[in-house]
Amino acid sequence: MAQYTWTVREGSLDGPVVMKNYVYGIPDKEPVEGQELYLSNGSGPWRVRLLEHVPGVPRSPYNILVVERVED
């Protein structure tokens, strides 16, 4: 199965775009809510708040990963 390509948004489903075409760095896995991660553009750490995806369509612009900044 192909990995999902995500549009990463900050704060909400209509929040500012942090990154487009993000692919999670671990093969055969996807991020989960509550997880902390760094994006491939070098930004982070971020905490995953919400994942919205189109089942069976890994390269959809409607695959949205909502994140929030992790405070030190």
Residue ranges: model-predicted function:
Residues G44-V54:
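Short beta-strand-centered aromatic/proline hotspots
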Residues K29-V32:
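Short, well-ordered loop/turn sites that connect or cap secondary structure elements
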Residues M19-P27:
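Short alpha-helix capping/helix-loop boundary micro-motifs
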Residues M1-K20:
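Short, basic/aromatic beta-hairpin or loop at an interaction surface
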Residues V54-R69:
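Short, solvent-exposed secondary-structure boundary/capping segments
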